[in-house]
Amino acid sequence: MRVSVFAVGRMKAGPERELVERYFDRFSKAGPPLGLEFAGVSEIPESRGQTAELRKAEEAQRIHEALDNGAALILLDERGKALGSEAFADRIGRMRDDGKRQLIVAIGGPDGHDPALRTRADLVLALGELTWPHQIARILIAEQLYRAATILAGHPYHRS
């Protein structure tokens, strides 16, 4: 299953970007033996629409256009369900085992995700009840994708 991360907005060079790249590099090495191929990060420009609803709709359209038929979609959203790392790994493993060829993990912009995109999502995931800056959300999902691969592989990185 090809795994991509779509993020609204750009991440500037710096230590946060380096940490994200480090975890995605680890994931790209750990994933293939498990049937998980990291396809990279796609940065979606923030909409310049006049209202939050218009901005969310435009950003959702860009994400929707990238989805293959039958692709799995995980949205990071504060209204989502908080999962532990093992449950998150299990969900990814089940998506892979169910024959999904593509998984997109989407990080929304400052206004969040459009309700229609939340309805389309296979999983709406919250990173806890706290609000996180975009850069930290990227770090967290990069680390959790790597952690999920190690859990699925039975590697000792994750200690429950």
Curated annotation (Swiss-Prot):
It catalyses: pseudouridine(1915) in 23S rRNA + S-adenosyl-L-methionine = N(3)-methylpseudouridine(1915) in 23S rRNA + S-adenosyl-L-homocysteine + H(+). S-adenosyl-L-methionine binds at residues 76, 108, 127-132. Its EC number is 2.1.1.177. Keywords: Cytoplasm, Methyltransferase, rRNA processing, S-adenosyl-L-methionine, Transferase. Gene3D superfamilies: 3.40.1280.10. It is found in: Cytoplasm. InterPro entries: Alpha/beta_knot_MTases (IPR029028), RlmH-like (IPR003742), tRNA_m1G_MTases_N (IPR029026). Its main location: cytoplasm. The keyword Methyltransferase applies. The keyword S-adenosyl-L-methionine applies. One of its GO terms (cellular component) is cytoplasm. One of its GO terms (molecular function) is rRNA (pseudouridine-N3-)-methyltransferase activity. Homodimer. Specifically methylates the pseudouridine at position 1915 (m3Psi1915) in 23S rRNA. Belongs to the RNA methyltransferase RlmH family. PANTHER family: METHYLTRANSFERASE, RIBOSOMAL RNA LARGE SUBUNIT METHYLTRANSFERASE H. This is Ribosomal RNA large subunit methyltransferase H. It comes from Brucella anthropi (strain ATCC 49188 / DSM 6882 / CCUG 24695 / JCM 21032 / LMG 3331 / NBRC 15819 / NCTC 12168 / Alc 37) (Ochrobactrum anthropi).
